[in-house]
């Protein structure tokens, strides 16, 4: 899903291309070799995108410069990570939230990329959390709805 912010369209695809395009002219402003099935999150001067390799990137919107990137830990061993997916990011209360299909939700600093903590959910999550009034709602695969402030 592309994101429109002002006169710029930000789009990312599974083909390892993240691109910023001028909405009026269609001219490419910048591109990076980052692929994702998740929608980028735009906030202020930055955008955040979770790559297909589960690296969370903070990128300057105007230039495409990568400010930081953090690997989201999907498991302790290679076998733990097989078939695991992640969704997000979603920004709320100065935290980027990432949910995983093996039942974890991570909070990451949007300023530094440091993982601030994680919680264990009752089951996996296949969709990004929804934020309502600074409360993050996680819908798990076993149909539990969990709210965190």
Predicted regions and their residues:
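WD40 beta-propeller blade core
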Residues: 19, 57, 106-107, 146
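Extracytoplasmic beta-rich repeat domains
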Residues: 1-4, 27-44, 69-90, 118-133
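Hydrophilic extracytoplasmic domains
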Residues: 100, 108-149
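Solenoidal tandem-repeat scaffolds enriched in leucines and small polar residues
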Residues: 1-17
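Short loop/turn segments that connect beta-strands within beta-propeller blades
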Residues: 22-25, 60-63, 109-113, 149
């Amino acid at each position: 899903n592309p994101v429109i912010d002002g006169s710029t369209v930000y789009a990312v695809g599974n083909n390892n291309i993240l691109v910023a395009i001028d909405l009026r002219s269609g001219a490419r402003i910048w591109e990076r070799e980052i692929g994702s099935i998740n929608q980028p999150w735009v906030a202020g001067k930055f955008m955040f995108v979770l790559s297909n390799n589960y690296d969370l990137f903070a990128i300057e919107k105007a230039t495409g410069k990568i400010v930081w990137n953090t690997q989201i830990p999907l498991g302790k061993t290679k076998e733990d990570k097989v078939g695991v997916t992640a969704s997000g990011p979603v920004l709320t209360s100065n935290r980027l939230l990432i949910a995983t299909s093996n039942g974890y939700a991570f909070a990451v600093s949007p300023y530094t990329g440091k993982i601030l903590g994680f919680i264990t959910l009752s089951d996996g999550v296949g969709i990004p959390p929804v934020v309502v009034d600074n409360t993050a709602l996680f819908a798990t695969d076993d149909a539990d709805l969990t709210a965190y402030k």
